[in-house]
């Protein structure tokens, strides 16, 4: 086992604090509407320009192992806040730095670290309750657009597009962010259920101009197997042909004789049909076929439940108002499924979302919920260069997380004002002893830090503006974008309550751990350098002429 370096008490805490400060100083320049950019080197390709706090934090690794531990712990603050609320990473980092700096001073002055931590925890818990009582529900499109604008660093167009997308697909809908092809940002909304499988043969196409299959009021046959024998399909085809309606077939695959016969009958006009493959793979394919069946009021023909294709009749088929198929996608619009069955299916998938630990599975399950309950919106980000595209896409994703958080837990006055308002309400909070009360004071002082940093980044004098905001009441605060004071709700400077709450809780939690650290252990770098070196290359003489 390699030898270790061990640092104790003041020496350990000082090194850790240095790491905290290096990381926080790099991250906090991005805070607020006038935050600066940070340029990140990439081992391949061009550097990345970002104003996203968590992206900056993730890039930082320090040479000194003890300083690096401090930096990594603050990185955890940013990551945790990002995971919970999707934004607020820079605010959380600024709060953590302030609590750690002031807390370390208290410990150095001889205060009890555990009592300081208890005081900090007490202040954070009280502040969280105040945030909840201060928050206002965020339901109208205007407020949602304002939250999106703030999170996208003051880009109004992004805020409006997100509000528009949320209105169109609802709270359950999925909104994805893609890179666009032009200079303009665009919003594309897919109504109904769309999946990424197109028609199996171009001979099914009904609209030659758009090369699309369009089936009006069709029957839908869902089959959980490969169809290659036409005899299996004949009973259903004959029944559908008699009814005079079109038929859409969604199966694992259709090939050979079955596909050829289907194409010939369609071209002759005997039956109007089109076929596509079922979406997904393995168990996910079965689940998605079941989703489609419930949405359209049909039954999946599956031998697993003792139902063969020869036994299928019109009662087993689903139906929809319209089905369209392109070369890549199939869309089912206005399925004839029973509302109660669809809701039950959505609840079932939601329960699976709660249970799953895989981010990939969770994302796929959420997509299924959206396809059943809401819809899917795609925001295509436009920009002049690839640099700008990547930076803008990251901002749009941040803004999207923020607006979701705002709809979930409401909004509070933005620009660091909410924490200053709460600080005023908690001035009389006292601990069980003097050290705990000092811990409370540390947390309350830290609550000014985000506003101070926003003002500093905007090039103004922090103390003057903080005192002016403290003297005000309610939603009165400072708008760093315009340099004006006033009602922040009227100005559209809003923060999601969930983001402010998560930032404070994450910062308080990790900073409390740092203050109560008494020893740090790391690998000894000298030990590694001494052993494991490459052998002497003495036998390489005679190669001097290669210089």
Swiss-Prot record:
Region span, Disordered: 525-547
InterPro entries the record matches: Chaperonin_Cpn60_CS, Cpn60/GroEL, Cpn60/GroEL/TCP-1, GroEL-like_apical_dom_sf, GROEL-like_equatorial_sf, TCP-1-like_intermed_sf
Main location (coarse class): cytoplasm
Superkingdom of the organism of origin: Bacteria
GO molecular function terms listed in the Swiss-Prot or TrEMBL record: ATP binding; ATP-dependent protein folding chaperone; isomerase activity; unfolded protein binding
Keywords: ATP-binding, Chaperone, Cytoplasm, Isomerase, Nucleotide-binding
Enzyme Commission number(s): 5.6.1.7
Residues holding ATP: 30-33, 51, 87-91, 415, 495
Compartment annotation: Cytoplasm
Residues of the signal peptide: none
Entry's Gene Ontology cellular component terms: cytoplasm
PROSITE patterns from the UniProt entry: CHAPERONINS_CPN60
UniProt record, GO biological process: protein refolding
Biased composition (Gly residues): 531-547
Disulfide-bond pairs as recorded: none
Catalyzed reactions per annotation: ATP + H2O + a folded polypeptide = ADP + phosphate + an unfolded polypeptide
Top EC class, one word: isomerase
Keyword Chaperone: yes
Function per UniProt: Together with its co-chaperonin GroES, plays an essential role in assisting protein folding. The GroEL-GroES system forms a nano-cage that allows encapsulation of the non-native substrate proteins and provides a physical environment optimized to promote and accelerate protein folding.
Complexes and interactors: Forms a cylinder of 14 subunits composed of two heptameric rings stacked back-to-back. Interacts with the co-chaperonin GroES.
Record-stated family: Belongs to the chaperonin (HSP60) family.
Protein name, entry field: Chaperonin GroEL
